[in-house]
């Protein structure tokens, strides 16, 4: 019984580190406008909800970022909580994102909820939603 608990804890620690790494890779990819990296990180059924109410699919979001229509000059993240439910991980965080998009410059402080799904041994982002915080 004790052995099983220790193995379960180690498994969760590995997944926790993998999710933190996936979050860092996502932030780096959007700042670098790295379409190929986003292609690997984002799930085919991605729902990407912006704080403006606009929703993107995987293809439309990669298109915006790769073309420069959604350009991130900076991204900072403070993770509040991660939670695992089987092969699903939830990440709740505070974000500061700034850059330029089709509406002009943005400098947003946000609450973020991301859902990651583990498939074939790797984590992919399947849902993203932000809400603006009071400045």
Residue ranges and their predicted role:
Residues 2-44, 84:
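Short, low-complexity N-terminal intrinsically disordered segments enriched in polar/charged residues
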Residues 30, 41, 45-56, 66-71, ...:
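A short gly/proline-enriched turn/hairpin at secondary-structure junctions
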Residues 42, 52, 76, 95-97, ...:
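A mature extracytoplasmic/lumenal domain signature
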Residues 109-134:
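Short beta-strand edge/turn micro-motifs at domain boundaries
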Residues 62-102:
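Surface-exposed, charged secondary-structure patches
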Residues 52-53, 102-105:
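Short, solvent-exposed loop/turn segments at secondary-structure boundaries
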Residues 26, 38, 46, 61, ...:
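Hydrophobic pocket/interface hotspot
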């Amino acid at each position: 019984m004790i052995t099983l608990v220790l193995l379960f804890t180690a498994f969760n620690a590995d997944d926790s580190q993998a999710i933190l790494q996936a979050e860092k890779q996502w932030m780096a990819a959007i700042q670098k406008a790295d379409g190929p990296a986003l292609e690997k990180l984002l799930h085919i059924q991605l729902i990407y909800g912006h704080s403006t109410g606009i929703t993107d699919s995987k293809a439309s979001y990669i298109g915006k970022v790769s073309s420069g229509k959604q350009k991130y000059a900076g991204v900072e993240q403070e993770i509040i909580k991660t939670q695992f439910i089987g092969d699903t991980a939830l990440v709740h965080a505070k974000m500061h994102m700034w850059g330029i998009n089709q509406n002009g410059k943005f400098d947003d402080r946000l609450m973020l909820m991301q859902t990651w799904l583990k498939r074939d041994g790797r984590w992919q982002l399947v849902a993203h939603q932000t809400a603006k915080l009071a400045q």
